[in-house]
Each structure stands twice: as structure tokens, then as C-alpha cells.
Regions:
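Extreme N-terminal basic, low-complexity initiation segments
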Residues: 1-10
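FabD-like malonyl-/acyl-CoA
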Residues: 26-174, 218, 295-325, 356
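Ala/Thr-enriched low-complexity intrinsically disordered regions
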Residues: 2, 20, 30, 346-348, ...
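Alpha/beta catalytic cores of group-transfer enzymes, especially the acyltransferase/condensing modules
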Residues: 41-43, 69, 81, 133-276
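Acyltransferase
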Residues: 214-299, 303-307, 318, 326-328, ...
Length: 360
């Protein structure tokens, strides 16, 4: 029998109880752990919502969210061209709205989601979708917030001509050092050998990728998740203060540092701050691994995050929910990996107060 460390509690010199650490082996047995993730800007493509309109209730929900946001989600999700949906003020509400309606198709009853999902996360604007899924704020609050986020970031991007480039491969430390040498910000640390750098057009032009790395310019409106977005942070801070929140009902993993956030107000604060701070998706994936995640479902417009996970999280079963045809496979994955409260939220010690039977 293995020995056990036991601590004793005293009050006024009298022994009142003891506590014993629970061996980690009892808490971390092999089990199924499901995470649902929401993609960010750039994942959208023309017509990606078209097949979803055949799902009962989706069109009506999209119409409602369109009214709330002032953006025609059905038009932009089914008929608008690539240039139109690349516009930040269009893309952001479209991505969040699409994620919200497809989440309801995946989990028609929210209680079913909370009983199945162990953790949630979103990349950049996808964090807003994840916050709604976790119960932090309502869909309507999210659509107003993301509408103003898109507008504010578009206005901030218009001040100075800026952009972003993806750096693929190479040593991450060398890529970051080379970027900072010319004044660029490593705006997205995506893991799996992908770093997105951002800054002025002149800075991007002067960037020289280290050996083994290649650079691909991104078609975005500006240097998101950098100091160039500071004006947007100021605007969103005022809006965020007006949002009534609830604490997350699942583990919500933050882009800022990969930490699990348990306080609803803190979630909103981080959503405000993240527009001018780097996205640390690499740390989010590391947290998922630390939590023992065994499966990941990515909601529409899906594909980007599961692609990163396949390289950075080997052994984790992934599913990109692209069309309604993927729903049966997603439900099967939920049945296999969805277990209520399986991620450890209990402390690694237990307090026992005498006289409890068997204490002494």
C-alpha cells in the first residue's frame, strides 16, 4: 500500500480534523473529454451557409440575428462574393451568427450541450461564439458586440495602411525575433508551425523569413490583434461594461494566455482586450491537451482549427462540421466523447472534519 501525506487542522491548539491529498491517479483516469471550438475571421467562404438553410429553424434564426446585428446574414452567407464577405464589418457578424445557429442544430437543447461539452474555445472573433455557447452572454448581446467590434476594427484599420502575413514553418523563436526586428507583431501564434505577423505595409515588406520558413500575405483589412487596434479596444470597453453576464457553464479557454476563465466579467474584459493583443491559439491547444481532451468538434465555417489540431494534438479525434451532412457523425462523436463534468474542477485535496465516520 502506498503511503499518504496527511495534514492536520487545529483551532486554539485542539485537533479538529485532517485533510489528505487525493492521489492524482484517481482523478486522471483515461476517459472521454470533448471540446467544441469556433473559428475566426478568414475561415468564411462564399456560400458556406447555403446548405444550412435546409435545416428547420436555421433560416428563421438567421433572420432574427440579422435584425439584431443590422447585417443580412442570409445574403452574405449564401450569395455574397469573396470580396464582400472579406469586409471586416460583414465577416465578423457573419462568422458569429453562423456559429450560433449551427450550434443550435448540433445541440437543440442547451442543457444537452452543457451535459456533453467539457470545454470550449474560439479563435479571435470565434471567442464571442464560444462565450455564448458557454452561457456567458446571450446571442443578441453577442451580435450587437460583434457588430460594433467589426465596425470599430474596420475604422481602426483605415487610420494606417497595415496588413498581416502568415509565416509557415521555420523555428518559431527565430520567426518571432525576425518579426520584432522590423517592428512587426506576432499577432497569431497558431501552433503547428504557423505564426501570423502584422504591422504596417512597409514593415511587412521588409520582413525576411528565417531559413525553412515561407511567407504568405493574408487578404485582411488591417493589422488585427496589434496596437493598431487600440482605438477599437476603447470603443468596445464601453460596450462591454453594459453587458450583463453569467459565469461560464463549461471550461472556457482564453486566447490571451490559454487559461481557463471561470468569471463572466473576466470573459468580457478579455474579449475587449483581445482585439489589440496576440491570439495564443498554441497555448489554447496546449491547455486542451493538459485537460485530457480526446475529441474536438469545430463549428462552421469549419476546417481551420481542426487542421491545426491534427498536427498539434495527435491522437485527438477531430470533426469539422461544415454542412448538415456532418451532423450524424458529430452526434456520434458527442455520444462517444461527451461526458458531463469530466475535466477536473475539484481541488487535489479534500477537507474532512471530525467526527466523520472512519476519520480517526
Amino acid at each position: 500500500m502506498t503511503s499518504e501525506l496527511v495534514g492536520f487542522l487545529q483551532r486554539n491548539g485542539h485537533l479538529i480534523g485532517r485533510f489528505a491529498p487525493i492521489p492524482c491517479g484517481f482523478l486522471r483516469k483515461a476517459r472521454a473529454v470533448l471540446v467544441v471550438v469556433a473559428p475566426g475571421q478568414g475561415a468564411q467562404s462564399p456560400g458556406f451557409l447555403t446548405p444550412w438553410l435546409d435545416v428547420p429553424g436555421v433560416a428563421e434564426r438567421l433572420e432574427w440575428l440579422s435584425l439584431v446585428s443590422g447585417v443580412d446574414l442570409i445574403e452574405h452567407g449564401t450569395r455574397s462574393d469573396a470580396d464582400t464577405i472579406r469586409d471586416t464589418a460583414v465577416a465578423q457578424p457573419l462568422i458569429v451568427g453562423a456559429g450560433l445557429v449551427t450550434l443550435l442544430s448540433l445541440f437543440p437543447h442547451p442543457s444537452g450541450a452543457y451535459a456533453s461539452i467539457s470545454a470550449g474555445a474560439g479563435h479571435s472573433v470565434g471567442e464571442i461564439t464560444a462565450a455564448v455557447g458557454a452561457g456567458v452572454m446571450t446571442a443578441e448581446q453577442a451580435m450587437v458586440f460583434v457588430r460594433e467590434r467589426g465596425r470599430a476594427m474596420a475604422h481602426a484599420a483605415a487610420v494606417t495602411k497595415t496588413g498581416m502575413s502568415a509565416v509557415l514553418g521555420g523555428d518559431p523563436d527565430e520567426v518571432v525575433a525576425a518579426a520584432r526586428e522590423v517592428g512587426l507583431t506576432p499577432a497569431n501564434m497558431n501552433g503547428s508551425g504557423q505564426i501570423v505577423v502584422a504591422g504596417t505595409i512597409e514593415q511587412l515588406a521588409s520582413f525576411v523569413a528565417p531559413d525553412g520558413a515561407r511567407v504568405r500575405a493574408l487578404e485582411v483589412a488591417g493589422a488585427f490583434h496589434t496596437e493598431h487596434m487600440a482605438p477599437a479596444t476603447t470603443i468596445l470597453g464601453k460596450i462591454g461594461n453594459a453587458i450583463t453576464t453569467h459565469d461560464p457553464r463549461i471550461r472556457l479557454i482564453s486566447n490571451k494566455d490559454g487559461q481557463v476563465v471561470h468569471d463572466g466579467r473576466e470573459v468580457i474584459r478579455r474579449l475587449v482586450q483581445q482585439v489589440s493583443q496576440p491570439v495564443r491559439w498554441d497555448l489554447c491547444m496546449q491547455t486542451m491537451l493538459d485537460l485530457g481532451v480526446t475529441a474536438m468538434i469545430e463549428i462552421p465555417p469549419a476546417g481551420t482549427l481542426t487542421g491545426l489540431a491534427k498536427r498539434a494534438m495527435p491522437g485527438v479525434e477531430t470533426l469539422a462540421l461544415k454542412t448538415p451532412d456532418d451532423l450524424p457523425a458529430a452526434w456520434k462523436l458527442i455520444e462517444k466523447h461527451g461526458v458531463h463534468s469530466v475535466i477536473d474542477s475539484t481541488p487535489t485535496w479534500r477537507l474532512v472534519i471530525a467526527p466523520a465516520k472512519g476519520t480517526f
